[in-house]
Amino acid sequence: MGERAGALAAFAELLVREGDKRGLLGPRELPRLWTRHLLNSTAVSGFVPSGALVADVGSGAGFPGVVLALVRPDVDVVLIEPMARRVQWLLDVADWLALDNVRVARARADELHGELAVDVVTCRAVAALRELVPWVAPLLVDDGELAILKGARAAAEIAEAAAVLHRSGLAPAWVEEVDPVVDGVHLFGEEPARVVRTRRVPRG
């Protein structure tokens, strides 16, 4: 994990240097950059199979997409982001960190329906699950999976999205809690990271 931790540290340095002036992270976020953003973003990595093609929707500053690309060099990640200044940031990061397993698409997820088919969709802090699902479900191949970072309302969002999950061809979703404690230290904060998971039901 040493090499991966070093890669995360390099990304952290870029965020500290550039994040505020590029409007990516406010100064109040910097003290909790590791716990709230970087390490929290690693929670999705255990749900991505080796060799997968991943779409990270609404990548913004790079959470969780850039983090996933750094800690899982065995997968390819498409960073989907509609805002020009954020797209430029993601292109710069991919260049500065020599991320050859990353490509950046300036688009909304729904603009890529029929053009992009992936094994896994990730995202964080984009929209409520009931709004998000119709945008991202069409990007999945059969048996492809959503792995979405959510907060304390994860279970409630699943309940609210039950009908749209079914209409979008997805199996019932569940919450996977990633234990944040390593050697007694809470890596992600006081609560576990919550990942909402579901998969695309094969189309007959």
List each language-model region with its residue ranges.
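Flexible, active-site-adjacent loop/turn segments at secondary-structure boundaries
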Residues: 22-23, 31-32, 61, 124-127
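Conserved beta-strand/loop positions that form the S-adenosyl-L-methionine
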Residues: 57-59
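Residue-level recognition of conserved structural "scaffold" positions that shape functional pockets
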Residues: 30, 65-67, 158
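Conserved SAM-binding loop of SAM-dependent methyltransferases across substrates and taxa
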Residues: 61-74
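S-adenosylmethionine
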Residues: 72-204
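Class I SAM-dependent transferase core
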Residues: 1-55, 71, 85-102
